[in-house]
């Protein structure tokens, strides 16, 4: 069920990251090469999850792997235990919690009208449900971490912290973010552009669906503009 996916991506996945932050306090905080294999493993896992997103034809699976890839960046930031790294990890977990939950909500909106999650079968929604296309665009821009969103703040802090700790990590980070932008654009174009496959009369969007998306994106934008709300 989609509600379970929203709770899993928005809350349960982030609880694991919070638990790691608490448990990492027992390890040494000084710079040591002991952490390098784990950082490389976390970033490589993020890249592999992003590449898996590019191969997905199932919309729900694509969003799920997207959440996994972002948590790879969070894990890498938590491991080095610097103030910027931990701040970026917390910011990205909160921001991506809203973003991934919103994407799952939009996937359910599409599924209720097409009864399929296959990307090629959900094309052409910009002609049928233009307001939903706007929500898709905003959610994908947040997923890409466009400035001045909180997603961008989190990723920028993580990138700065990892670069200061080990400059070579910028290669894996840059590759991960490039692939993230690629699959986000692919997801948006596959669900909204092109000729529609629907032959029957499509049910219009309901006020509750717009309210649900508003309750996801408005808090995220407010936190992006005023981070003091969560500090």
From Swiss-Prot:
Keywords: Electron transport, Membrane, Mitochondrion, NAD, Respiratory chain, Translocase, Transmembrane, Transmembrane helix, Transport, Ubiquinone. The keyword Acetylation does not apply. The keyword Transmembrane helix applies. Its EC number is 7.1.1.2. InterPro entries: NADH_UbQ_OxRdtase, ND/Mrp_TM. The chain crosses the membrane at residues 1-21, 34-54, 63-85, 89-111, 128-148, 156-176. It comes from the Eukaryota. Its main location: mitochondrion. It holds the Pfam family Proton_antipo_M. One of its GO terms (biological process) is ATP synthesis coupled electron transport. It is a multi-pass membrane protein. Belongs to the complex I subunit 4 family. Core subunit of the mitochondrial membrane respiratory chain NADH dehydrogenase (Complex I) that is believed to belong to the minimal assembly required for catalysis. Complex I functions in the transfer of electrons from NADH to the respiratory chain. The immediate electron acceptor for the enzyme is believed to be ubiquinone. This is NADH-ubiquinone oxidoreductase chain 4. The lineage of its organism: Eukaryota, Metazoa, Chordata, Craniata, Vertebrata.
């Amino acid at each position: 069920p989609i509600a379970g996916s929203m709770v899993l991506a928005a809350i349960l996945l982030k609880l694991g990251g919070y638990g790691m932050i608490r448990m990492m306090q027992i390890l040494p905080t000084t710079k040591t090469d002991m952490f390098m294999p784990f950082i490389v493993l976390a970033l490589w896992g993020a890249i592999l999850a992003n590449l898996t997103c590019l191969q997905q034809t199932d919309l729900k699976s694509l969003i799920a792997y997207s959440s996994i890839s972002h948590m790879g960046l969070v894990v890498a930031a938590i491991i080095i235990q610097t103030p910027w790294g931990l701040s970026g990890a917390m910011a990205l977990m909160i921001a991506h919690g809203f973003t991934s939950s919103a994407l799952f909500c939009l996937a359910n909106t599409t599924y209720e009208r097409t009864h399929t999650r296959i990307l090629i079968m959900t094309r052409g929604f910009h002609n049928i449900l233009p307001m939903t296309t706007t929500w898709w665009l905003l959610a994908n821009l947040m997923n890409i971490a466009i400035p001045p969103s909180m997603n961008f703040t989190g990723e920028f802090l993580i990138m700065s912290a990892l670069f200061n700790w080990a400059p070579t990590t910028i290669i894996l980070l840059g590759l991960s973010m490039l692939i993230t932008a690629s699959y986000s654009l692919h997801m948006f174009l596959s669900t909204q552009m092109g000729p529609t496959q629907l032959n029957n009369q499509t049910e219009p969007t309901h006020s509750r669906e717009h309210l649900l998306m508003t309750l996801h994106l408005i808090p995220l934008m407010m936190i992006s503009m005023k981070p003091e709300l969560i500090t």
